[in-house]
UniProtKB/Swiss-Prot annotation:
InterPro entries: RecX_HTH_1st (IPR053926), RecX_HTH_2nd (IPR053924), RecX_HTH_3rd (IPR053925), Regulatory_RecX (IPR003783), WH-like_DNA-bd_sf (IPR036388). This is Regulatory protein RecX. It comes from the Bacteria. Transmembrane segments: none annotated. GO terms for cellular component: cytoplasm. Keywords: Cytoplasm. Its main location: cytoplasm. GO terms for biological process: regulation of DNA repair. Belongs to the RecX family. It comes from Bacillus pumilus (strain SAFR-032).
Length: 263
């Protein structure tokens, strides 16, 4: 049975020591593991002892890495597991580390999911379907996801969607209502809002001001079109202006009405 012939401190890490068995380097361990297993010169170690020591060392090392990783922000169990796997911590040790992290309340997937929904709802204006997809990618169980999303009911979704609609309307104010609505619907769908919430948000954001906003946008685009075609009042140039505005999504009746007013 091999025995410890030498224990030496590592040059670059004073918290770890090298263990030599029968005059040959065998492995390194944390000082806490050294004390825990009462490792000293002359002690005999069989294969089971070595496996147990190395397992304890992997848990010690991985636990500290996990705590450091968690110090920046909350993480899901899957995120911590993936991180430790990349750090080459053995799977059995990772299981023990996760158990310890849960015991000390360093990780909790339900709390993580609730915080994630709250944060990304407010800061990134995301809808429930996108949040659900992102949480699933982070390894959160379905029941935890549903519980977390319960704090994001329809009224809050509508409130957030209306803010997004108003912001986009201001940004795209010189486009036709049709074109603006198309852009809004696409963007809010990508953000994870349902068709029902999007339609309600559009109704609430416009609140009966569609015609006024449409005419303002049409006047702006008409001046742009006239400059582009070199408008001189002729029938040919008038048709070119109408075609330009129609392609931009404006209604033909509205175009004729505004053109006639401007003559």
């Amino acid at each position: 049975m091999p025995y410890i012939t030498k224990i030496s401190a590592q040059k670059n890490n004073t918290e770890r020591v090298n263990i030599f068995l029968d005059e040959k380097y065998a492995f390194s361990v944390d000082l806490d593991v050294l004390v825990q297993h009462d490792l000293k010169k002359g002690k005999e170690l069989d294969e089971a002892d070595i496996i147990d020591i190395q397992f304890g060392d992997a848990v010690k090392k991985g636990f500290q890495q996990a705590v450091d990783y968690l110090s920046y922000r909350m993480r899901s169990v899957k995120e911590v597991t993936d991180y430790l796997t990349k750090k080459e911590i053995p799977a059995p040790a990772i299981s023990e580390i996760i158990h310890k992290l849960k015991h000390y309340k360093y990780v909790n997937d339900l709390e993580f999911a609730e915080a994630y929904v709250s944060t990304h709802r407010k800061t990134n204006s995301k809808g429930p379907s996108v949040l659900k997809k992102e949480l699933k990618l982070k390894g959160i169980e379905d029941d935890h996801i549903e519980q977390a999303l319960s704090q994001y009911p329809d009224d809050l979704q509508l409130e957030e969607a209306v803010k997004q609609v108003q912001k986009l309307v201001r940004k795209e104010k010189n486009r036709s209502t049709k074109e603006i609505e198309q852009r809004i619907k696409l963007q809010l769908q990508r953000k994870g809002f349902s068709f029902e919430i999007i339609d309600k948000a559009l109704q609430e954001a416009y609140d009966g001001q569609e015609e006024e906003k449409e005419e303002e946008a049409l006047l702006y685009m008409m001046e742009k079109a006239k400059r582009k075609v070199g408008y001189d009042g002729s029938f040919e140039k008038k048709m070119k202006v109408k075609q330009f505005l129609f392609r931009k999504g404006f209604d033909l009746d509205t175009i004729d009405h505004v053109l006639d007013k401007g003559e």
